[in-house]
Amino acid sequence: MRSHLLRALLLAILLALPAHAHAAPPAGKLTWYGQACFLLETAAGTRILMDPFAKGIGYEIPQGFKADIVTISHEHPDHNNVAFVAGKPRVIRGLTADKKGWTRVDEKVKDVSIRNVGVYHDDQRGATRGLNTVFIFEVGGVRIAHLGDLGHVLNDAQLAAIGAVDVLLIPVGGTFTIDGLKATRVIEQLRPRIMVIPMHYKTDASTIKELESAALFLDGKQNVRKETSNTIALSPMKARPAAEIVVLPYK
């Protein structure tokens, strides 16, 4: 009898605990600086900067910026400005030095697993704008895919190589990349579990006139959340019926 009462008491205590008591610890956070530039900061303090831009495209470069690692999806100046970072970070490039092939990245750096998948900057197998790289980061049970300047919908081999995605960073501005309609198709292909963050589109700050705004991509979508901060927390969670589209400001 006493054991039954004890079990009932323990169950009541567990049920009374707030929901956040059972939540998984945060994996880290993402900050968007504009264009395709994101900073991933892990809970352990690792800082990875993706596709830093050069001066002259309208966005500000923070002074004294620190990062452990910089990833470069392709060698265009709005994506490969290593000087964005103070000091001497480790640089992981997606393309070979001659830009005619992809590097092979599949390694663990501190608490982050990093790998890459070769894709194209256009829908002509690179004939117009060259090669591009998808980088996949995994930390704390969360997989983040940064599509760089993806210029096409994905084929079966590319989809298999990318694999499961929780958080998708996807270009939507067209002209140099997929536009809003093709971005929607790529999301349908990859089926991210948690979140989609659009990037590489026209904003009030951007001086790249050829870019489209995010309006075409967002048109008709119901699951959109517009944030007031350019930083968002990352935590492992169950898959949603449809990934939430999170629009970040660039500062």
Regions found by a protein language model. Name each.
Residues 1-7:
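Positively charged n-region of N-terminal signal peptides that target proteins for export
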Residues 8-18:
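Bacterial N-terminal signal peptides
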Residues 23-69, 90-163, 167, 175-178, ...:
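Core dinuclear metal-dependent hydrolase active-site scaffold
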Residues 46, 89, 191-195:
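A short helix->loop->beta-strand "cap" motif at the edges of active sites that frequently abuts
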Residues 55-59, 75-81, 152-155, 175-181, ...:
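Active-site environment of divalent metal-dependent phosphoester hydrolases
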Residues 67, 166-170, 174, 180-201:
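Proline-aspartate-enriched helix->loop->beta-strand connector
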Residues 67-77:
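Metallo-beta-lactamase
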Residues 193-251:
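Accessory terminal helices/loops
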